[in-house]
Curated annotation (Swiss-Prot):
Name the record gives this protein: Transcription factor Sox-6
Compositionally skewed regions (Basic and acidic residues) per UniProt: 100-111
Keyword Nucleus on entry: yes
Lineage of origin: Eukaryota, Metazoa, Chordata, Craniata, Vertebrata
Keywords: Activator, Developmental protein, Differentiation, DNA-binding, Isopeptide bond, Nucleus, Transcription, Transcription regulation
Recorded superkingdom: Eukaryota
Disulfide bonds listed in the record: none
Organism of origin: Xenopus tropicalis
Localisation: Nucleus
Length: 777
């Protein structure tokens, strides 16, 4: 289309040329007009088929040539040139679609020339003019047709919709479409608002998710940091524990070295009185760790009623070490102090403490503060002391205190060893001979002195045995309890600084002197009623003679309180409750034979309280009648009540049952920390077969001789054992040997208790029940 529009200026030029040459060629071409038209008709469609640009260019090139020919040559030449042009034009058109051949062009040219040359010259001129005219007309028609085609193309480009829009395009309509109607504006605002809210919610969701991710990451980082801190703390704690273990091991090594180096210096012996949990653990550890070596045997004369440990161990116990650490410390001490061949433990002799001979009777006339039992009662709450009064006497300051001999003053006094017991007794086996066990150079440094002392002691023992055979009546199978105390540890004793502590050993001369002085009270003659004297252990019974670990309990016979042994026991008159309960108790026992007496008493007490005064009236009348009869029968009767069965522990007043439960719980707690091994008791027999069990006996988990309880009940079940050392203080001597001292230890009358049930019937026991034997629980 652009080519057609560009061809329009050329068409104008052709029209101007046509006007200039029209007059000249009109006359020449009139004659041959028909022929030329006939010959050129087939060319029209070819011209139409050609593009307009090519067609116009060919015409533009031919028109100047025609003008030159008209002016220069004749019409003949003009016709020839025209015919040549036409032939060349035709050949060009045909060559546009097919390759040009020279022979074909020559043939066409000859044919055309023959056709053109046909006729007269006038006719040829006319035909040429006609051809030119026809060409001009065709060109004009083509120009008009091209203009029409241009207009149709524009119309096609501008579609009807576009025309409509262009027609409606004005300022008012444009402004209206831009501004819009109120409804459209409201709709658009609503859409915008919803879109804004959606965007805001989406933004909030994104922010929340981002915050959650941040929090999660922060929490993970915090957890990791905490785990790292925990691991670091655990590592530090492990390092501290290892450091503490190393320090403790170092301390143990130092203590072992001190014990080995300073073994010749007697350590300060501190008694262990378990009053709280820490010292309970220390005492149990002492019981476990500081046991006597198995080579030493002990007899009734062993003056060792309390467990002692070195001051270093007591300081360790008081420093708050854990039970495991104490146990390790004691085990290390024990391992370092084991007696082995070649080891030398020097001895420390003890000088004469006080002149004269001290008898147990004289010791009993002293205050209780001079005996170790007073110190025990002052230091700790014990089960047997239910109404103890504080003692202010210091046993260490007293010249007659047995503990005075535990602290040596000099090392120059002679050493004398003897049998542990003042009672001459043959030895059943070599393992039981303490002199044989002591006859070792590993125990003492000065071997010559030791051997001399041992020989002298053996001679004295043989002499005592001969005297015993001559006077067998001096020992009648009875041993006063007081003879086994600490009171006989006197000036002529020595301190054997053995493996675990101080062992006070009597000399044979002192033991013989004491037995000569105590002849009347060693007879152990039965009383008028056939019972043994008070405070005497009957070792002639079959179950007691077997001795050793088979001795499960010690039979102790107590005398009647507040009267001599010859006075009969006077029962109190029954009160109204007892009159009523006598028959009721019998009924309950018939219905329930296995019911315990304490439960029956509880039932009877509740029933008595529920009774009315009218129901109780006949029983009160019976009480008055019985009281009158009792007063007539015993006009000088005076009731001496027993002390209340209560005890004060840690400032609290407890009944005996509560106290036993407390002690049982403490023992159970102590067993959780320590396991005390069994130390069997070594019996020592006389020629008559009498067995004297050692006064130092360790209580074990199995039934073994334990401390005799002054407040034990016959109906109480055996309690779990506690590591104690059996003390035989608190017993009575025979009234004849005391020389008028009816009480056991002067002012301490109220500290001995008879066992009885809580029910009032115990006040109405018979004479035979007053001296019943009580088993030590």
């Amino acid at each position: 289309m652009s080519s057609k529009q560009a061809a329009s200026p050329f068409t104008c030029k052709a029209e101007g040329e046509e006007e200039m040459t029209g007059d000249l060629a009109s006359r020449e071409m009139n004659e041959c007009k028909d022929q030329i038209m006939a010959s050129h008709l087939p060319l029209h469609p070819l011209n139409h088929n050609k593009p307009h640009s090519e067609e116009l260019q060919s015409l533009v090139t031919t028109l100047p040539a025609d003008l030159d020919w008209d002016s220069m040559i004749s019409s003949q030449h003009r016709m020839d040139s025209e015919s040549n042009k036409l032939r060349s034009l035709y050949s060009f058109r045909t060559s546009s679609t097919s390759p040009h051949k020279p022979d074909e062009g020559a043939r066409e040219r000859s044919d055309l020339m023959s056709s053109v040359n046909f006729g007269t010259p006038e006719r040829r001129k006319g035909s040429l003019a006609d051809v030119v005219d026809s060409l001009k007309q065709k060109k004009l028609e083509e120009m008009t047709r091209s203009e029409q085609e241009d207009s149709t193309c524009v119309e096609k480009i501008l579609s009807k919709d576009w025309k409509d829009k262009m027609d409606r395009l004005n300022t008012s309509e444009l402004l209206g479409e831009i501004k819009g109607t109120p409804e459209s504006l409201a709709e658009k605002e609503r859409q915008l608002s919803t879109m804004i809210t959606q965007l805001i919610s989406l933004r909030e969701q994104l922010l929340a998710a981002h915050d959650e991710q941040k929090k999660l990451a922060a929490s993970q980082i915090e957890k990791q940091r905490q785990q790292m801190d925990l691991a670091r703390q655990q590592q530090e704690q492990i390092a501290r524990q290892q450091q503490q273990l190393l320090q403790q091991q170092h301390k143990i090594n130092i203590l072992q070295q001190q014990i080995q180096v300073q073994g010749h210096m007697p350590p300060l012996m501190i008694p262990i009185f378990p009053h709280d949990q820490r010292t309970l653990a220390a005492a149990a550890a002492a019981q476990q760790g500081f046991l006597f070596p198995p080579g030493l045997s002990y007899k009734p004369g062993d003056n060792y009623p309390m467990q002692f440990i070195p001051s270093t161990m007591a300081a360790a116990a008081a420093s708050g070490l854990s039970p495991l650490q104490l146990q390790q410390l004691y085990a290390a001490q024990l391992a370092s102090m084991q007696v082995s061949p070649g080891a030398k433990i020097p001895t420390t002799p003890q000088p004469a403490n006080a002149p004269g001979t001290l008898s147990p009777t004289g010791m009993k006339s002293e205050k209780r503060g001079t005996s170790p039992v007073a110190q025990i009662k002052d230091e700790a709450a014990q089960p047997l002391n239910l109404s103890a009064r504080p003692k202010t006497a210091d046993p260490i300051k007293s010249p007659t205190s047995p503990t005075q001999s535990f602290f040596p003053m000099s090392k120059t006094s002679p050493v004398s060893l003897s049998n542990k017991s003042g009672i001459p007794s043959p030895i059943r086996g070599p393992s039981l001979d303490i002199l044989s066990s002591l006859n070792s150079p590993a125990l003492f440094g000065d071997q010559d002195t030791v051997m001399k002392a041992i020989q002298e002691a053996r001679k004295m023992r043989e002499q005592i045995q001969r005297e015993q055979l001559l006077t067998p009546h001096s020992i009648d199978g009875k041993l006063p309890i007081n003879n086994m105390g600490l009171n006989n540890c006197r000036s002529d004793k020595m301190l054997l600084d053995a493996v675990t502590g101080k062992i006070c050993i009597r000399s044979a001369h002192t033991e013989r002197t004491h037995f000569e002085n105590l002849g009347p009270q060693l007879t152990g003659k039965p009383n008028e009623d056939g019972k043994l004297g008070p405070g005497v252990i009957d070792l002639t019974r079959p179950e007691d003679v077997e001795g050793g670990a088979t001795v499960v309990e010690a039979r102790v016979y107590r005398d009647t309180r507040g009267r001599s042994s010859s006075e009969p026991h006077i029962k109190r008159p029954m009160n109204a409750f007892m009159v009523w309960a006598k028959d009721e108790r019998r009924k309950i026992l018939q219905a329930f034979p296995d019911m315990h007496n304490s439960n029956i008493s509880k039932i009877l007490g509740s029933r008595w309280k529920a009774m009315s005064n009218q129901e109780k009236q006949p029983y009160y009348e019976e009480q008055a009648r019985l009281s009158k009869i009792h007063l007539e029968k015993y006009p000088n009767y005076k009731y001496k009540p027993r002390p209340k069965r209560t005890c004060i522990v840690d400032g609290k007043k407890l009944r005996i049952g509560e106290y036993k439960q407390l002690m049982r719980s403490r023992r159970q707690e102590m067993r959780q920390f320590f396991t005390v091994g069994q130390q069997p008791q070594i019996p020592i027999s006389t020629p008559t077969g009498v067995v004297y069990p050692g006064t130092i006996s360790m209580a074990t988990t199995t039934p073994s001789p334990q401390m005799t309880s002054d407040c034990s009940s016959t109906s109480a079940s055996p309690e779990p054992s506690i590591p104690v050392i059996q003390s035989t203080y608190g017993m009575k001597l025979d009234s004849g040997s005391l020389g008028g001292n009816d009480l056991m230890n002067g002012e301490d009358e109220m500290e001995m208790y008879d066992d009885f049930e809580d029910d009032p019937k115990s006040d109405y026991s018979s004479d035979n029940e007053a001296n019943e034997a009580v088993s030590a629980n």
